[in-house]
Design a protein with these regions (language model features):
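Short, positively charged
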Residues: 1-62, 66, 70-235
Length: 235
């Protein structure tokens, strides 16, 4: 079930953020309206800084707390959010174990993806149309097993930091960050099914990853000789 949520006031709280319904909220949006008229986006940024609202550390899954509930913020429409950000094969093994159904089914699908890439049947990003056409990342068994991986990275934690001190209880999806009419809340038990048709899988290279032996099975050659071997998931 999707619910619209009401306007409130942003305040920092121990590395996560709280959004209480208070009279100060109109002040925040008054600043935003002024910034739009003047073309001064940094006015909004300065106001947020004064309120103690900053980017959460990477080990924290909840971006904001609203009415004592911790939420993760996800953008819809243009600038869609990343759900799994450049993760290696060994990272999935570390969290889920090499013998788990979740990892083994994911591993098999990534290998199918790599074969399709090498055969030039698909390009880097694989959305629903290509998933269905080439039967990758789409089977019922994969959909069932992948839920635990999805839920971990979206709500619970990361590979590097482990379980988050502030796990997300639900998702606040927004089209325009400062337009509450575009905000919707998804509970944990409904967000995966909501995202399923929109999931885009890709194998990329980001930064200078420290690959391990276990990562080699996912290596996909590139023109510069450096392999692509990190799985990304976005909507």
């Amino acid at each position: 079930m999707i619910r619209q949520i009401e306007l409130g006031d942003l305040k920092g709280l121990n590395g996560a953020y709280r959004y209480d319904q208070k009279d100060a909220a109109p002040d925040f949006f008054e600043v935003h309206e002024h910034a739009v008229k003047m073309g001064l986006d940094d006015v909004v940024i300065r106001r947020l800084q004064k309120l103690g609202v900053t980017k959460s550390p990477s080990g924290i899954k909840a971006d904001v707390g609203i009415n004592k509930a911790y939420l993760s913020l996800k953008m819809s429409g243009v600038g869609k959010s990343s759900l799994i950000n450049h993760q290696t094969r060994s990272g999935f093994i570390k969290i889920f174990g090499s013998n788990s159904d979740a990892f083994q089914l994911l591993d098999a699908e990534v290998l199918k993806y790599i074969k399709c890439r090498r055969d030039r049947l698909i390009t880097e990003d694989v959305g629903l149309d290509k998933r269905e056409e080439f039967n990758i990342f789409i089977s019922d068994s994969f959909r069932h097993a992948f839920r635990s991986i999805f839920d971990y990275f979206v709500f619970e934690g990361t590979v590097g930091w482990g379980a988050s001190k502030f796990p997300a209880e639900c998702i606040l999806s927004f089209g325009k960050a400062l337009d509450p009419s575009t905000w919707s809340v998804y509970q944990r038990n409904e967000y995966y099914d909501h995202c399923w048709p929109s999931l885009v899988f890709s194998l990329r290279r980001h930064g200078r990853p420290k690959f391990r032996v276990a990562d080699r099975a996912w290596f996909l050659g590139a023109d510069d000789g450096a392999p692509k071997g990190q799985l990304s998931l976005r909507i």
